[in-house]
Regions:
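AMP-binding/adenylate-forming domain of the ANL superfamily
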Residues: 29-45, 115-121, 256-272, 424-437, ...
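A short, small/polar-residue-rich loop/turn motif at beta-strand boundaries
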Residues: 1-30, 59-76, 92-136, 338-350, ...
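Short amphipathic alpha-helices and their capping loops
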Residues: 1-47, 69-113, 195-255
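Gly/Ser/Thr-rich phosphate-binding loops and adjoining beta-strand/alpha-helix segments
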Residues: 23-30, 47-66, 132-155, 243-313, ...
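His-Asp-centered acyl/peptidyl-transfer active-site segments
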Residues: 2, 46-51, 68, 79-80, ...
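Active-site-proximal acidic secondary-structure segment that organizes catalysis
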Residues: 2-8, 108-115, 126-199, 456-470
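Extended, hydrophobic beta-loop-alpha segments that form or line the acyl/peptidyl-thioester binding
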Residues: 78, 82, 171-172, 300-307, ...
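Acyl/amide activation-and-transfer machinery of modular secondary-metabolite enzymes
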Residues: 2-4, 37-59, 88-112, 133-138, ...
């Protein structure tokens, strides 16, 4: 499992078909449930052409009608895919929702294209979504010239209806629905799924957000984290990120990269050592990141935003929607020794081994830093920004997701499954997504496409790999403190 732009995925030559939900104008119903503050902020601030999605190779033969029924069942199950917004009389936004039976999934055969043509066309098909116009999710299929291994299916969605976990859930759900549709399972049975609605969640999120006050603790905590000027911290190394000098720099596409950092064995070892120290694998991975940043760039203090899920209620565990809050992390490793230290390995020279005492200190610092910010995750940052006069956005974001227990995760490699993000632009953001998978630990990153940033990211990723080589049964033993 990797998280990349679609251009990094190997698309075949074949027959391309777009799959688009449609609903008659008269079937939309006024919906009194409120939008979340985050949704409203997204309507105001989202960039044109921004989307997220997923792609996989569906096993089995391509059959258009079962695929249509599977896509319709998926959209019927998840109400957020059948809701949108319209302007109200006061120039604000109000919600309208279509019942499942009002939605039809229409296909349009584009035709047979070469692999290069498919690679050029598919991103534009999937980018045809917007937060202000339904549908907010569209799909496309590619039936290859040699369809023995199945066919490619991808979707693109606006972020207002989708988060990373929803992207991951889709793989198993759509393959299972397609298989059931091919077996003739009735539509009513295909649609049946007891799952919560993100529309309900959004209304509750707004209720909670409206209890916040400008002089309340959540707002003060965020303002303290941001500091003077209420600006988000940047990556501490010179030249990696910087404000765009002009419009041309702001419009420059960012570099995108995916790299495997550790084997399953190495990741499991770090996880076990972190748990033994009263923390989690997340703390261990973030400690490794902090160690690498300090070794490469001399950064003792890292301040970043950690996205975390808000799927607290069990009915939302398998729901499609945007269930994400922000955790401010202020991590200071001053006084902590390097996690790795060099020891004399005899005739083969010096080797780097894990310093147990330093690992304990680093993991404990990470655990405490995340725990300090975690209570703020449940509160809408959009509302906090409004109350606190915060107009800046995150410049350094670090995400960690353990994907191994998502339904179907053990089959993702067979399906060549991948989560997708659209290209980003500018010079002032560095995002890293750490994914723990059945194949090991991967990092996806986007960063400014500048020589300085490329050098910095090359060094950071190599140092992360070097760090993980010290873990696992093939690595070196932990040094005696």
């Amino acid at each position: 499992m990797e998280y990349t732009e679609l251009s990094a995925y190997d698309l075949p030559a074949g027959v391309v078909t777009s799959w688009t939900p449609r609903a008659d104008a008269g079937r939309w119903q006024q919906d009194p449930r409120d939008l979340s503050p985050g949704h409203e902020a997204h309507l105001r601030d989202s960039e044109p052409g921004s989307w997220i999605g997923s792609v996989l190779r569906v096993p089995g033969p391509y059959e258009p009608e079962p695929l249509r029924r599977a896509v319709h069942a998926w959209m019927s199950r998840h109400e957020v895919l059948r809701t949108t917004v319209t302007r109200d009389a006061g120039a604000g936004w109000r919600r309208v929702t279509a019942p499942a039976e009002a939605v039809a999934v229409r296909d349009l055969v584009v035709g047979h294209l070469t692999a290069a043509q498919v690679t050029a066309l598919l991103p534009s098909l999937l980018a045809d979504v917007s937060p202000t116009a339904w549908p907010h999710c569209v799909l496309a299929s590619v039936v290859p010239d040699q369809p023995a291994d199945g066919f490619v299916l991808a979707f693109g969605a606006d972020h207002s209806v989708m988060d990373a976990y929803s992207q991951l859930l889709w793989f198993e759900e759509i393959v299972s629905l397609y298989d059931a549709a091919r077996r003739g399972v009735p539509d009513a049975e295909l649609r049946a799924l007891e799952v919560g609605s993100h529309v309900d969640f959004s209304a509750e999120d707004r209720k909670l957000a409206m209890t916040l006050a400008a002089d309340g603790e959540p707002v003060h905590r965020w303002l303290d984290f941001l500091g003077p000027g209420a600006t988000f911290p940047r990556y501490g190394a010179d030249g990696v990120t910087h404000p765009a000098a002009d419009a041309a720099e702001a419009a420059r596409p960012q570099a995108s990269r995916s790299a495997w950092l550790a084997t399953v064995d190495q990741t499991d070892d770090l996880s076990a050592r972190s748990r033994a120290r009263g923390a989690s694998a997340q703390s261990g991975v973030l400690a490794a990141f902090a160690h690498a940043a300090r070794r490469v760039h001399g950064i003792d203090r890292l301040r970043f935003v950690l996205p975390m899920h808000t799927r607290y209620a069990p009915q939302h565990a398998a729901a499609v929607g945007w269930y994400v809050g922000l955790c401010p992390v202020d991590l200071d490793l001053d006084g902590v020794d390097p996690v790795l230290r060099e020891v004399d390995a005899g005739g083969i020279g010096a080797k780097r081994v894990v310093d147990g005492t330093a690992l304990t200190a680093a993991v404990e610092r990470v655990h405490a830093a995340v725990a300090a910010g975690k209570p703020l995750v449940r509160y809408s940052f959009a509302r906090i920004a409004e109350l606190g006069g915060i107009t800046d956005g995150p410049h350094l974001a670090v995400s960690y997701v353990d994907t191994r227990f998502v339904p179907g995760a053990e089959r993702w490699s067979d399906w060549d499954a991948r989560t997708l993000r659209s290209p980003a632009y500018g010079t002032d953001e560095l995002y890293l997504w750490f994914l723990r998978t059945h194949d090991g630990l991967n990092v996806s990153t986007r960063y400014p496409d500048t020589p300085e940033a490329h050098v910095a990211m090359d060094a950071l990723i190599e140092e992360l790999r070097a760090c993980f080589r010290a873990f696992g049964t093939a690595g070196l033993s932990e040094a005696v403190a």
